[in-house]
Regions:
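Carbohydrate-binding surface patches
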Residues: 135-176, 184-187, 219-222
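Aromatic/acidic polysaccharide-binding cleft in carbohydrate-active enzymes
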Residues: 14-118, 122-142
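Extended hydrophobic-aromatic, low-complexity segments
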Residues: 20, 82-85, 155, 163-167, ...
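Trp/Gly-enriched beta-strand surface patches
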Residues: 175-209
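Structural recognition of the beta-strand scaffold that forms the well-ordered cores
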Residues: 6-11, 69-74, 153-156
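C-terminal beta-strand-rich structural cap/linker in extracellular carbohydrate-active enzymes
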Residues: 197-229
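Active-site region of glycoside hydrolase catalytic domains
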Residues: 3-18, 65, 147-148, 164
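Short helix-capping segments at alpha-helix termini
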Residues: 1-3, 174-175
Length: 229
């Protein structure tokens, strides 16, 4: 990115195009074919799975660390776009607002990846600074650190199908107090209603100069923050 310029990544979304992902693509097509209102040509049927949330978190963290000033997720609502016919929807959204009217009431349920995406973006408000992070020894784990006005977010994502243990260290930020900890993974979400994510732990102190050991569930996103909201 040229110095002094800003760039926004638009329409982040995953399609299974690599040979290594061929089995996922076969399953994606099978799921789309079994759903009456899904576009067979342009749907991401893994939006119902927690793994899609960690994939999208991974993409966002890489985008942030590369120097982009913002990003847009593809997409908000299934009801926004159809493909082969008016009733063949592009299944990519956080939900389907017309579920009860046309496509089944369960389609209005908030899907897992909403919680991963909204958690990260909630704690990267406009004007946030992004700090350089280095990850070593574990290719399935990515990290991002950002902050504004003395408040910080530390985000870790594990896209592996097995648990990982990592160590958080900083020679700049010696400690971080008053932290909340959020854990996004299957079976760990704490929610209020169908849209608000609650912390799994609160009032934590991270001793970053000494190092903090963190155990991450498979396919998980962990966020520490001392923002007071």
């Amino acid at each position: 990115i040229p110095e002094g310029k800003k760039i926004v990544m638009g329409e982040i979304g995953f399609k299974f195009v690599e040979k290594a992902d061929s089995l996922y693509q076969k399953e994606n097509i099978r799921r789309a074919g079994s759903k009456v209102n899904a576009s067979l040509e342009d749907s991401q049927m893994f939006v119902y799975d927690y793994m899609y949330g960690t994939d999208m978190a991974d993409a966002l963290i890489q985008t942030v660390n590369t120097g982009f000033s913002g990003s847009i997720a593809w997409m908000l609502d299934d009801a926004m776009h159809s493909n082969e016919a008016p009733d063949k929807l592009k299944i990519w959204g956080f939900w389907n607002i017309f579920g009860e009217e046309c496509f089944g009431a369960e389609e209005e349920n908030v899907r897992p990846w909403y919680y991963a995406w909204s958690l990260l973006t909630r704690y990267m408000p406009a004007g946030t600074a992004v700090y350089r992070t280095d990850t070593t020894g574990e290719p399935f784990v990515k990290a991002a650190v950002s902050g504004k006005d003395g408040k910080y977010m530390i985000a870790l994502v594990n896209v592996s199908d097995s648990p990982k243990t990592v160590k958080l260290k900083s020679n700049v930020l010696s400690s971080l107090s008053g932290c909340k900890k959020f854990i996004y993974s299957d079976g760990t979400l704490k929610q209020k209603g169908d849209c608000l994510l609650l912390p799994n732990d609160e009032n934590l102190i991270l001793h970053l100069e000494k190092g903090e050991t963190v155990t991450m569930p498979a396919e998980s996103l962990i966020v520490y923050t001392n923002y007071d909201y």
